[in-house]
Amino acid sequence: MRKFIAALRLALAAAAHLLLTLPPAQCYWLNPEIYDAGGLSRRAFPEGFVFGTAASAYQVEGMAKQGGRGPSIWDAFIEKPGTIPNNATADVTVDEYHRYKEDVNIMKNMGFDAYRFSISWSRIFPNGTGMVNQEGVDYYNRLIDYMVKKGIKPYANLYHYDLPLALHEQYLGWLSPNIVEAFADYADFCFQTFGDRVKDWFTFNEPRCVAALGYDNGFHAPGRCSGCDAGGNSTTEPYLAAHHLILSHAAAVKRYREKYQLYQKGRIGILLDFVWYEPFSDSNADRAAAQRARDFHLGWFLDPIIHGRYPYSMLEIVKDRMPTFSDEESRMVKDSIDYVGINHYTSFYMKDPGPWNLTPTSYQDDWHVGFAYERNGVPIGAQANSYWLYIVPWGINKAVTYVKETYGNPTMILSENGMDQPGNVSITQGVHDTVRIRYYRNYITELKKAIDDGAKVIGYFAWSLLDNFEWRLGYTSRFGIVYVDYKTLKRYPKDSAFWFKNMLSSKKRN
C-alpha cells in the first residue's frame, strides 16, 4: 500500500507539473465552475434575447497615430507624465484594428450573438468636421462586413469618450453649442455609410461620465475642473457639457429618424451608466439622499429623454447654474430613444450627510449625499480590483426595476456588466477567473428575475471581450473574459469565456 501511495503521489506531482507547463487553453477542464450555469440558459430568456460583448474604439483598436486617424482629447490628456500608470498609452493597446477577425471568431466560438463596438469620430473625421479619412471608413467597413459574415450582429456606438482634439482646441468641445451640429453631421455620415448593415445604434456611451469626470473632477479627458491645470469651473461646466451632450444626442436621433430609419429599418438609443444607490437606512433623510443620487446620476440624462426636462430635484438644487431647454429643444429631446442601454457594475449605500453647504463647489457636492460601502460592519459586497467596484448582484435587479417603474418600462439593453482583475496577474492565474464566473452567474440571475417581473430587457452585453486599456488605470485592470498578453498580444480565453459558451449552448435549465 505504501508503494502504491508513493507512486500515486509521484504521478500526481508529475501531472501537476505537466499542467503548469501546458498553455492555459489546454487546462480549462480543471474548473468545474465552467459547467455550472446556475439554471441559466438561452431558453430561460425571452425569444430573440441577445447576448454579446462590448468594447470601445480607444480601448481596443490601437493604430492611434496611424491609418489617418486624428488625435482625440484622450491622446492629449495622457501625454502628461504620471497620468496613466507606467505612462502607458493606447497607441497599440490590443490591436483590434489588425486582429478584428480573430476577435470576431472568438465571439462566434463562444456563442455570442452581437458585438457592441464604438466608432472613433477622429478616425472618420480627423479634425472633427470636413475631410473624411477613407482609411478609417474602410476599416469599419471591414469590421462590420466580417461581423455580418460570421453572424455577429453589429451594435454601433458613435461616441465613447474620444472627442476629436481639434474640436476641443477650436471651441472647447462639449462646452460650446457648436458641437451639436458637428456631432449630428458625423452621426449622419455614419448612418449613411454603415446603416445598410448596422441596425442598432447608440449615440453616446455614459455621457454622465463625459460631463462629470471630464469637467467636474478632471479625472478624465479633457481634465477640466475648478483648480485643474487645464482650467474649468466645477459648478457650471459639467451641466453645460451635459446639456450639449443631450442636445447632440437628440439632433443625431432626429437626423436618423427623418432620413434613414424608415428604409434602413434600424433603431437608435443611448448608453447610460447607473450605479444602484441603496438607502443606508429607512430614515426619510437617507431615502431622500438615495433618490437625489439617482436623479443626479441617471435622471440627469434619462429625465430629459423621457420627459423633456431635467429632474425637479436638480432644478431645485442647481438653480440658475442649470441650462434650460427651449420649447423646440424640449420637443426634440423628449422621446428621442427607441431603447436605452443601461451599464451597471456595482451598488453603494447612500446616507444623508447633514447640513447643506450653501456655497456651491461642484456637481458632486450638489448631490449632497454620503457614500457608504458597509453597514453594521458588513460590506455591501466583496471588492473587485477597482476601488469602486463592489460585487452586489441584487443591485442589478433593483436598477433595472427602477428604470421600469420610474420611466414607463422603456425597452432596455443591459449594455455593460463585468468586473476586473489586477493587471499584473499571470496568464495561468488570469485565465482561471472563478470570481468572474460567479459574478456573471449571479448578476445575470438577478437580471432574469427583473425580466420575469416584467422589465423589457432585450439583451445583455458583457464588458468586455478582451483585457484592454482601462482609461486612467491603463493596463493595471483586466475586465476581459479573454486574457491578453500585452507583450505578444496573444489572446487566451478565460474560464469565464467558456462559462458563457456552456451557458449559451445549454438547451434547457440545468
From Swiss-Prot:
Glycans are attached at residues 87, 127, 233, 424. Residues 1-27 form the signal peptide. The active site is at residues 206, 416. It catalyses: Hydrolysis of terminal, non-reducing beta-D-glucosyl residues with release of beta-D-glucose. InterPro entries: Glyco_hydro_1, Glycoside_hydrolase_SF. Pfam families: Glyco_hydro_1 (PF00232). It is an enzyme of class 3 (hydrolase). GO terms for biological process: carbohydrate metabolic process. GO terms for molecular function: beta-D-fucosidase activity; beta-galactosidase activity; beta-glucosidase activity; beta-L-arabinosidase activity; beta-mannosidase activity; cellobiose glucosidase activity; glucan exo-1,3-beta-glucosidase activity. Its EC number is 3.2.1.21. A beta-D-glucoside binds at residues 59, 160, 205-206, 345, 416, 463, 470-471, 479. Keywords: Disulfide bond, Glycoprotein, Glycosidase, Hydrolase, Signal. Disulfide bonds join 225-228. Hydrolyzes p-nitrophenyl beta-D-glucoside, p-nitrophenyl beta-D-mannoside, p-nitrophenyl beta-D-galactoside, p-nitrophenyl beta-D-xyloside, p-nitrophenyl beta-D-fucoside, p-nitrophenyl beta-L-arabinoside, cello-oligosaccharides, laminari-oligosaccharides and sophorose. PANTHER family: BETA-GLUCOSIDASE 44, GLYCOSYL HYDROLASE. Belongs to the glycosyl hydrolase 1 family. This is Beta-glucosidase 26. It comes from Oryza sativa subsp. japonica (Rice). The lineage of its organism: Eukaryota, Viridiplantae, Streptophyta, Embryophyta, Tracheophyta.
